[in-house]
Design a protein with these regions (language model features):
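Extended alpha-helical surfaces
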Residues: 1-284
């Protein structure tokens, strides 16, 4: 992925970024005293709403989703490598597979939960779940869906569908990261999986769950194995864990989180914030 290949795309991104809500605009929105003033602040952005729509959560969600769909559609259209965009949309693909699997298991109408973002259409994903056929997607996707469905048949527990697709997502994410063969993208995949594992272990420890519970939820696709993550975090070695998974050089913004790790006071929500911070800094 050379700079020359993406130079035109980067220009297009710069133009589109100019229409986004800026940090200062966002702060103004938070401090805005009325729907009318928020309407004015949103004019000229992809999220323009009138004062009545702003009060309607359904209308607000629909507008945000429309804007999100438009951005990803544009990204797929202009990117010289669609897999690069897929790296960021894959979470929607596996969310949709969960929805279709749950529909298959319960026969409940869940279509309102589908998010039509990603390289595979909803029709392709629905067909995949119905037939376990790999006609329009990689064979390993069909294998993971079929294996997850078989496990559900054995245990009759909907949580199996959630866990199976989460772990399949991380395997697919690792595959994409390796195939794109760019150090920053490989680090991004590591960070995504490493933080998922850590957040999962943190919640499990807070709830005093056993090792067996943790192991069934964790992925071995990160930079540390599930066993290593459990051993480190169960013994309170949060800082050791972070030093091993953090791809960034020294950053003053991380000090607060590191101190809380050192004193054992880091909360789950702070760990989630830290993941976002590391990813943002990595891609900046």
């Amino acid at each position: 992925m050379s700079e020359r290949t993406y130079s035109q795309v980067n220009t297009g991104i710069s133009v589109r970024e100019a229409s986004f809500v800026s940090p200062s605009q966002f702060e103004q929105l938070l401090a805005s005293p009325s729907s009318e003033s928020r309407e004015g602040l949103l004019q000229g952005t992809p999220y323009a709403l009138d004062s009545h729509e702003i009060k309607d959560l359904s209308a607000l969600e629909a507008r945000l989703m429309t804007a999100l769909l438009a951005e990803y559609q544009w990204a797929f259209e202009v990117s010289p490598q669609s897999d690069l965009v897929s790296l960021f949309t894959l979470k929607y693909t596996y969310h949709n597979l969960k929805v279709y699997l749950k529909h298959k298991a319960t026969e409940r109408k869940l279509g309102h939960l589908l998010i039509p973002i990603g390289p595979y259409s909803l029709d392709v994903l629905e067909h995949l779940v119905a037939t376990f056929s790999a006609e329009h997607c990689p064979a390993f996707m069909a294998e993971e869906v079929a294996a997850t469905w078989q496990e559900f048949q054995d245990y009759q527990d909907l949580r199996v569908l959630e866990i199976g697709m989460d772990l399949a997502y991380f395997k697919h994410l690792r595959y994409l990261g390796d195939s794109l063969d760019h150090p920053i993208l490989k680090q991004l995949v590591d960070v995504t999986i490493d933080f998922y594992n850590a957040i999962t272990v943190k919640r499990a420890l807070d709830q005093q769950k056993p090792h067996s519970f943790m192991h069934q939820l964790l992925s071995d696709e990160g930079s540390l194995s599930a066993h290593q993550v459990i051993d480190l975090l169960e013994s309170g070695q949060w800082l050791t864990w972070f030093y091993q998974v953090n791809p960034l050089e020294y950053d003053l913004a991380l000090e607060t989180y590191e101190e809380k790790m050192r004193t054992g006071q880091l909360k789950t929500v702070e760990l989630e914030y830290l993941e976002s911070l590391v990813k943002f800094s990595l891609l900046d």
